[in-house]
Amino acid sequence: MASQPPQPPSGQPDTQYEEYQSEVITETTNRPTPAADVYEITPTNDVMDDRYEHEHDDYESGAMYETVRTWSPQSRPELVRIASVFSRIDSHPDVAPTTEDGGQLNRRDTLAGVKIGDPVLDPTKPEFDFYKWARMFTHVMEKEGIKRNRTGVMFRNLTVLGSGSAVQYQDTFLSPFAAPFRPGELCGKGRNPEKVILHDFNGAIREGELLMVLGRPGSGCSTFLKAICGELHGLQKKKESIIHYNGVSQHTFKKELRGEAVYSAEDEHHFPHLTVGQTLEFAAAARTPSKRVLGLSRKDFSTHLARVMMSVFGLSHTYNTKVGDDYVRGVSGGERKRVSIAEIALSGAPICCWDNSTRGLDSATALEFTKALKIGSQVGGITQCLAIYQASQAIYDIFDKVIVLYEGRQIFFGPTRIAKQYFEEMGWYCPPRQTTADFLTSVTNPKERIAKEGYENRVPRTAVEFERYWKQSQNNKLLLANMDRFEAEYPPEEGHLEKLRETHGQAQAKHTASKSPYRISVPMQVKLCTVRAYQRLWGDKSSTIATNISQIMMALIIGSLFFDTPQTTDGFFAKGSVIFFAILLNGLMSITEINGLCKATEPIVPNAQRPIVVKHVNFAFYHAYSEALAGIVADIPIKFLLALVFNIIIYFLGGLERSAAKFFIFFLFTFITILTMSAIFRTLAAATKTIPQALALAGVMILALVIYTGFTLQPSYMHPWFKWILYINPIAYAYEALLVNEVHGNRYRCATPIPPYGSGKNFACAVAGAVPGEMSVSGDAWVESSYDYSYAHIWRNLGILLGFLAFFYFVYLMVSELNLSSASSAEFLVFRRGHLPKNFQGSKDEEAAAGGVMHPNDPARLPPTNTNGAAGETAPGGSTVAVIPPQKDIFTWRNVTYDITIKGEPRRLLDNISGWVRPGTLTALMGVSGAGKTTLLDALAQRTTMGVITGDMLVNGRPLDSSFQRKTGYVQQQDLHLETTTVREALRFSADLRQPKSVSRKEKYEYVEDVIKMLSMEDFSEAVVGNPGEGLNVEQRKLLTIGVELAAKPQLLLFLDEPTSGLDSQSSWSIVTFLRKLADNGQAVLSTIHQPSGILFEQFDRLLFLAKGGRTVYFGDIGKNSETLLNYFETHGAEPCGPSENPAEYMLNIVGAGPSGKSNIDWPVVWKESEESRHVQQELDRIQSETSKRNEGHGQSAEKEPGEFAMPFTSQLYCVTTRVFQQYWRTPSYIWGKLLLGLASALFIGFSFFLQNSSMAGLQNSLFSIFMLTTIFSSLVQQIMPRFVTQRDLFEVRERPSRAYSWKVFLLANIIVEIPYQILLGIIAWASLFYPTFGAHLSSERQGILLLYCVQFFIFASTFAQMIIAGLPDAETAGGIATTMFGLMVTFNGVLQKPNALPGFWRFMWRVSPITYTVGGLAATSLHSREVKCAQNELAIFDPPSGATCAQYLQKLVEAGAPGKLYNPMSTSQCQYCPLSSGDQFLGGSEIHWSDRWRNFGIGWAYIVFNIFATVALYYLIRVRKSSGRPNRIISVITYHLSQFGTYCRAFITGRKEKCPRKREQIGKIY
């Protein structure tokens, strides 16, 4: 490092300063006026002055107009690219525009030259011309006095702070135990230290300017854009930092004008089931101004505006297509990106910040998008900032200014045209073919930048030195002077704020606060969001209908369960049960409102829609509470209809009193309960940050609500430490009201009078509330004696429920508005404790690690001059020759065609594609968006799971065998890795399973170390993969993806799908030049790439170029300087490629890529008829002929392949099980969440039912305590399934196609790993529940049996979860099915309805329910031989006949074998008879017997074994056979016979006797 701070080179004259100093003098006195015919628009002088009065800039001299002048105003494709210029117009044929004095304009506007109502102004017509539409709009806006805000932004001393450090340590299961030995971390010190993300930024962006933000990933580009827009959620801006918008402070601007500065995130968030038209029409409606052109209605204005934007961005054909997402089929990824762009354009914001919005777009589309931004800035005055990772020279030249960031420090800010010269004069060398954007970013990469000769010790090296150099430069001084003039023009809070307020107020609707950032009032927001909520429901009708049907089916099941309940005292428990079920199911059906991460269709899923709501709130579309209120309003009618159907079924089928008054009271309370519980669950979801948090809290809350309803634990048996829950439980008030409503005024015949032969006053009914000598029991007396309920409380309870409802709705709306932002933190690496590299530093000097500054003539740094030469050294480096095994096999494909069926219609994705890949060559696969590049790659790699592929794919002339996938590497576009593993462990896992058994483990691991060195991953080889932001960054993940495939030593070919996607230009260069090195050393490589720069493109040897429809445009050599490729296109009619033009972009342009691109030449037809195409076929024939001769020379003794997998089954099982154990161990949140759920639930149940007495109610409560333990089953299952899905996704997407290990190994490993934790959970639950509930007096044998049952139950839960999720696509779908099945199991286990009371149809359900045997075994073991001591209200109290004792009077009853016990046999009055004498008698009513305990235990293990076999069978039938493309035999047989049955039915109905073909051979094809 230089001893002195770097200075500007003294030997070089500061030509920049002299040049721009002179420009400042000339600009302020002789500012050029733009040509009036640039767009053939002639605005009035007032508009001209308003637009250009502040255009002078110390850096600019009219250059911003030069680019536009070169674009032909007559070229409609160029004009269609105008993106966000205007957002207010309609050409209503029946309305004439008016001038300011009230006069009407003529139907033919001479200024625009277009007749209002002309088809060119209708975006739905093919004649639509956006240019003419914009001209008409501009004129009408001027005449009607409609204004729009315009503003620039200035930032001074901008410093942004975040939390986090450069490194964190991975937590494990034992981390909580080690925390006391790390007091610093325990106290919060050192865990999240403050970190400066942006250091002291300065700059000014004038209105209408376009700023490019350049920097490597992690340099602070996103944070800078967020700071400009004021969206620093979780980050902190220093007090000294100043940001203002033409004099308006950011605080005031964001408070009153939030929607005027918007930030477009890199990811897209939309409601997937809304169509594109609905999405954009909503955005237009939310920002529709109050004053509109031509006096149009809001509906017409917003609809037309959305249509215009869809036409501009090439989305008109998707109007009725769903937006979709990763789970819902919709528009393509590129189209979804354009939907996001159009949404922001419709916001009409004068300041827009775009975060890598060109990601995933091909170069032609990216260029169109950038041109659209440019025109929006120049014509609409929009100030725009765009962070971009890979920018072509054409894109770079469109921008006015550029800011370069280096590790959070500003190292340049100024005009784009001087940036390159600035860094060259600093001493850096720019290679001739490198784009300016790549060069500017490369100077921030020590491994990429090149110093000029003689400047090696003078150039800055670190980010701090670059920043120091910048601050001492004349360009910075000029910038500061310009900022001073900017502030002088716009004094703080003066003038411009009132102007902005006036313009904003003009756009606001009535009843909207003047200082509100929103344009429409709250009622209008609620109405708009309510309509959208119903659109979302309609968009996912199937899901909505399925949910409602499942609820109705549950009502039918529960109602039939209690069908024909006797209207006697024996029916009291059944009535309590059916009402308990009714209120519980009504109340808890809203719990699904919490979960909906992948289903944002329901208008009540706060967590699912939160990112979308946050985005729309930032765009000032609506208040968050308006969306929340709209969800409530939209949901009430749906809930009402569902509740009506549900409660009619359960009320009348369940045997409740058929009284109109009582039914409507029943419905009123159940409906209010639904709304109240919905409000509670909404509040819970809105108050938490993630769905798992909300579900965890909901699980505990539901347990408390169920126990303290009053049914499972009667109020008189509640202990004081938890009884308070009863008073805050809405379900408890509803249950009391419904129960007293049902029995009020009714008397019930005594089913079992004691003694049955008594008369007069000499008998009693053994039911609470009974009166001696009466054969019936008052319902009111029963509920008062049993529950202390009163009919007088019914309307009081309704008032309490309404109070709960209002309170939670209010809290929900408030929390929805306040709990939107999420904390942000700096990115960091995660290491295992004890594995941090010794030389690792948080922000180390990469220059020193790189070994100094590179020289311009160093051959290791210069790009190769010919495609066959050695590639330059890049970040992934090292010795490659000794690592890559030699390859000799040639992979060829001929006439590959791929057809699929979509909605019953055939579609061809690939059309007769031919080609080959030789060892030692690097082949590029390119094409326009939607051409089928990834599809072709999947087809060649044998990774398609649907459709029909035809054609020949050969290796050395032989058909592909079962080992092909194992012998090839496939680097997917998505970097899928297990987040808990380290880089080295991931590579070793791949080497262990994918290299053959003949290679020793030592050799495999040595090869892994070679791969680590080859990819330069030494610094993070022990880092944990983690999640984005908390682990490896984008480039490191991509290197790991490549490394995993290299570690497998692919013998044939390496496929790569978009290896540079999401990377900056330097990282992309590193990856591609590394691939070049692999090819030079014998590897065959085929890679798709969509945005290659000129120097990247020349790294490839051969190109396969596809057009839409999967048709070949070109296949052949690229040639030196792309001469071979360019000659082909130029000789077939294409315009010549310019000497400085990027050949990759040139090709995309000539074939008509981009939303509005067109080509007059059908290039696929040209290729098909070309000589080059015939040469390809001849070469394929020659290759096949040569390889066939070679194969014949070797005879039939070809090397025998080891088979589908490289390693045997046992080795696979060991490796995979070890990794899954490792994943669980390193995911303490899951393990501790599981254990704490079991511990907390068991303790809560145990202390709620603490030491129940031996009364009949006490025994019932004890049985309910066991029953409640089984209710945590559902929560456990919901926890297990997402973990399984995580492993399965990785296996099915990457490891199974690579033939790393068998699907049977995957299933067994996941089953095995769950068992130890389930055993531990069973032990915890056993100790936490049974000791508090039953005490320690049980024998050791019984305690042991209880422990065995608890462990068995939790193992059953895990295997059941895996059985359900095995064949289903996601945890949400499986969770719904599991919950339904669990509901059936607990319903029919004999606790809530005794088996002998079940209708005959349902008795089989009691026998097949696994919970029946678990509850039976636990209850029999706990209550066997327990003596019953009836409570006072449970005794049958009566007087014996005069002169007889109680024993004498009941002697006949005792001799008949009555189960009860007489407490006072010698008394002559007030005989006290308890109907039961032992716990076995009580259990016998539920058919639970002590003698069945071991039988039940054995049946439990049978269910576990069944779950395991069913898991394997379901996975095989649904996912293995389906993915293999083979027909499912069972489904085929069923389908065949159903079709035959249907044929006979049709013949019978029509009276025709058709003969159905049932020949043996036809059935044989199926079987």
From Swiss-Prot:
Places the protein is found: Cell membrane
Broad class of where this protein is predominantly found: membrane
Residue spans of biased composition, Pro residues class: 1-11
Region described as Disordered: spans on this chain: 1-37, 1172-1202
Residue sites binding ATP per the record: G927, V928, S929, G930, A931, G932, K933, T934
Domain ABC transporter: residue ranges: 167-432, 891-1134
GO molecular-function terms, A-Z: ABC-type transporter activity; ATP binding; ATP hydrolysis activity
Expression triggers: Expression is induced upon exposure to a wide range of unrelated cytotoxic compounds, including ethidium bromide, ketoconazole, cycloheximide, fluconazole, griseofulvin, imazalil, itraconazole or amphotericin B.
Superkingdom of origin organism: Eukaryota
Swiss-Prot/TrEMBL catalytic activity: voriconazole(in) + ATP + H2O = voriconazole(out) + ADP + phosphate + H(+); fluconazole(in) + ATP + H2O = fluconazole(out) + ADP + phosphate + H(+); (R)-miconazole(in) + ATP + H2O = (R)-miconazole(out) + ADP + phosphate + H(+); (S)-miconazole(in) + ATP + H2O = (S)-miconazole(out) + ADP + phosphate + H(+)
InterPro entries, sorted: AAA+_ATPase, ABC2_TM, ABC_trans_N, ABC_transporter-like_ATP-bd, ABC_transporter-like_CS, ABCG_dom, ABCG_PDR_1, ABCG_PDR_2
One Gene Ontology cellular component annotation held by this UniProt entry: plasma membrane
Family, per entry: Belongs to the ABC transporter superfamily. ABCG family. PDR (TC 3.A.1.205) subfamily.
Full protein name: ABC multidrug transporter MDR1
Organism: Trichophyton interdigitale (strain MR816)
Gene: MDR1
